[in-house]
Amino acid sequence: MPVLREEQHRIGRIGWLRAAVLGANDGILSTASLVLGVAAAHATHTNVLVAGVAGLVAGSMSMAAGEYVSVHSQADTEQADLKQERAELKADDKGEHEELAAIYIARGLDPALAKQVAEKLMAHDAMGAHARDELGISKTLTARSLQAALASAGSFAVGAAMPLLVTAIAPEAALIPLVSGTSLVFLALLGGFAARAGGAGVAAGAIRVTFWGALAMAVTAGVGALFGTVA
C-alpha cells in the first residue's frame, strides 16, 4: 500500500491567520488613531495615555466577542446543513448518489466514472463525501469559534500595545509625529508578514495596509483637531 506524503498548505492556516492579522491590524490602527485624535484635541499626555489603554482593553474584548459570535454563527449554519444532509441521505440514498454523481460530472468526469466514484465514496463515507463536495465543508475550513476569538483578541492587544508603548515614552511635543510614523511602520511590517504567510506579494500587502492606515489616522487626527479648536 503506498504511503501518502502529508503536505502543508497555506489554506490550513486561513482561520487563525485571518483572525490574527485582522486583530493586529485593528489594534495598531484603532489605538494609534484614538491616540492621535485625542492628542490633536490638545489633551494632556496622561489623558492621551489613559484613552489608549482604555481603547486596548475595550478593543480586545470587542474583537473576541465579535469574532466568537460571528464564527459560532457560521459553525451553527454548518451543523444545520450537515443535519439536513444526514436526513436526506437516510430518506433518499439513491437520490443523493445521483446528486453526488452529477457534481462530479459537472467537474469533468464522464457519467459512468462519476457514478462509480460516487458509489465508492458513499460506501466509504457518505456523509463526508456530501459534506465536502456538496456543501463545501471540510476539516481544514471548519469554523472554530474559540480559536478565532482568542487569536483575534490576543493579536489586537499585541497590535494596540505597539502605538501605546510609543505614546508612553514619546515626549508630548513630538507625540503625534512619532505615533503616526511608527504606527505606519508597524502596519507595513504586518501587511508584509500577512502577505508572505498567505503566499502573496509582500510589497503589495505592505502598501495596501499602510495606505488605508494613513488615511484612517489622518481623518481621526483631523476630527480631533477640529473638536479641539471648537472646544
Region annotations inferred by a language model:
Residues 1-16, 71-153:
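Cytosol/matrix-facing amphipathic helices and coiled-coil assembly/linker segments
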Residues 12-23, 45-53, 113, 144-150, ...:
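The feature identifies polytopic integral membrane transport proteins across all domains of life
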Residues 189-214:
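Interfacial loop-to-transmembrane junctions
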